[in-house]
A protein has these predicted regions:
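C-terminal, charged and often intrinsically disordered regions of DNA end-processing helicases
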Residues: 229-230, 244-248
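Terminal end segments
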Residues: 260-263
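Terminal recognition/anchoring or ligand-binding modules at protein termini
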Residues: 339
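Active-site Gly/Thr loop motif
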Residues: 237-245
Length: 343
């Protein structure tokens, strides 16, 4: 595939990958036998070396690797996929080191479950949608994360909840928090596909790297309503608001995200211009949906927390909105643990 183009400017692509040889003690002056295309030799169910029709063809080598990866006898592929999906829903994988299933990685907490899920996924069409459905409808996933008196014995035996006797309480990802605020305002753009959107101001710099300023971006621009997955990521200059919520930078490999609770997060969720503008937009929507403060409070909790307020909450929130304004009430709701955390 790399050789199928017209030479331009005198460039002549090589006919295939150059030969690679094992070096004695890593010394380039002492080459030993040539290495042929292959994969891991520790998997007894699959051949360690690829049988390619043309050893020198780069495309044939890649095709052989692809066939090796999706082979039904390859245990690593299916285990790795289901482990990462499990990690997405529970906060940590059955194997806590998703990038390392080897000797230096963590031991699986539920090896039989990992194998069962891997085989089920492999033999049922490899549908990620069906795998998500299977997990979220399980009794394990539907457990509460609240501590109960009956769980005191389990708390003593497994304080870190490795064996999932309750659900883990987790904070929403940075992208989910941003999208949840947009959803509450009614401005979330659900269009799928298309190019990413640059949600920052970009001006030429004195050198190669341009000047990026997130604070000068127009938060009323339609581009700011796209879902977070369509944000343009500038790898070396991440969005400070998203970074404060543990959104990883684009220039690092992050198999497991940090999940912290810090003062900086509280300050960002209360003072950032993005939160302030979304609070104003949310208040505008509430005024259009409710004729008085009581109705607006009722709708506000339905849109942010998915429930109706209690009588005590209703009285307190109405008094707060009357004294400090509906915009500040919306900002308070965006900062509630019930909005930011998943129980």
């Amino acid at each position: 595939a790399a050789s199928d183009f017209e030479p331009d400017g005198g460039l002549k692509p090589p006919p295939g990958p150059r030969p690679i040889q094992i070096l004695k003690r890593g010394d380039i002056r002492q080459p030993l036998e040539e290495v042929t295309p292959g994969a891991l030799s520790c998997l007894s169910s699959l051949p360690a070396r690829f049988k390619t029709n043309n050893v020198a063809a780069e495309g044939e080598r890649r095709a052989a690797l692809a066939r090796w990866l999706v082979d039904s006898r390859n245990p690593l592929t299916w285990r790795s996929i289901v482990n990462r999906v499990w990690q997405l829903h529970f906060g940590h994988g059955i194997v806590a080191t998703p990038n390392d299933f080897g000797r230096m990685g963590a031991v699986p907490t539920h090896p039989e479950l990992l194998d069962w899920l891997a085989i089920w996924f492999r033999d049922n069409g490899q549908s990620l949608k069906q795998l998500h459905y299977l997990i979220v409808t399980s009794a394990t996933y539907r457990q509460t994360s609240a501590a109960r008196t009956a769980d005191e014995a389990a708390m003593k035996l497994d304080v870190d909840n490795h064996f999932l006797w309750r659900m883990n309480r987790s904070r929403l990802d940075a992208e989910c928090i941003r999208d949840a605020m947009l959803c509450a305002t009614g401005k979330l753009d659900l269009r799928m596909g298309g190019p990413s959107d640059r949600q920052f101001s970009l001006t030429p710099g004195s050198h190669v790297t341009p000047i990026i300023d997130y604070s000068k971006f127009d938060l009323d621009s339609p581009l700011s309503n796209r879902r977070s997955i369509y944000r343009f990521l500038f790898r070396t200059l991440p969005d400070p608001f998203m970074e404060s919520l543990d959104c990883p930078a684009g220039d690092t490999i992050t198999p497991v995200r940090d999940n912290t609770v810090t003062v900086q997060q509280a300050l960002a969720l209360w003072n950032d211009a993005l939160v302030a503008r979304r609070s104003e937009q949310f208040a505008e929507r509430l005024r259009s949906l409710g004729n008085n403060t009581a109705e607006q409070v009722e709708v506000a909790l339905q849109l942010t927390l998915g429930r109706r307020p209690s009588e005590a909450e209703r009285a307190e929130l109405i008094a707060y909105a009357d004294q400090h304004g509906l915009e500040n009430l919306c900002r308070v709701l965006f900062n509630l643990n019930e909005f930011v955390f998943v129980n």
